[in-house]
């Protein structure tokens, strides 16, 4: 899989109409781990496993499902759901200095860095909610 930075917007929003209830939300951009996603309802960030679960990932798209008792019911005038990707800035693979070259692992690592670059672009080009990214960048030690 290859992530095309120009074709990848790591943010999607949904409007749940007044009185309607929705429990599943499509994540139409690639992510790797459940913790890569932020889920907001009317501007309030929800907690993974407490308010929602994630299916998919591993470099693919997926779905966020609300947990029991946490479905999104449209408030007066509707409710807004926003899903963003926020991949922790970290190198997760270490390649040995000898042995077989691991092309698939290298491609996954490069896809992660491309996704991180896309997340940073989103930080500067989209309205809130977008918390998390700057607070997770490593300090200069």
How would you name each of these model-derived features?
Residues 111-126:
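Compositionally biased low-complexity segments at domain edges in trafficked proteins
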Residues 124-127, 131-141:
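Single conserved hydrophobic/aromatic residue that forms the stacking wall/gate
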Residues 1-110:
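N-terminal assembly/attachment segments of tailed bacteriophage virion structural proteins
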């Amino acid at each position: 899989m290859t992530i095309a930075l120009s074709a990848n917007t790591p943010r999607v929003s949904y409007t749940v109409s007044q009185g309607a209830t929705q429990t599943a939300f499509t994540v139409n951009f690639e992510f790797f781990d459940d913790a890569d996603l932020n889920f907001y309802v009317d501007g309030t960030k929800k907690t993974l496993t407490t308010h929602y679960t994630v299916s998919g990932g591993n470099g693919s798209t997926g779905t966020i499902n609300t947990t029991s008792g946490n479905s999104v019911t449209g408030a007066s005038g509707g409710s807004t759901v926003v899903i963003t990707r926020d991949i922790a800035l970290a190198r997760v693979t270490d390649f040995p200095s000898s042995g077989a070259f691991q092309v698939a692992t290298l491609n996954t690592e490069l896809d992660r860095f491309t996704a991180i670059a896309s997340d940073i672009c989103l930080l500067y080009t989209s309205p809130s909610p977008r918390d998390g990214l700057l607070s997770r960048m490593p300090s200069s030690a």
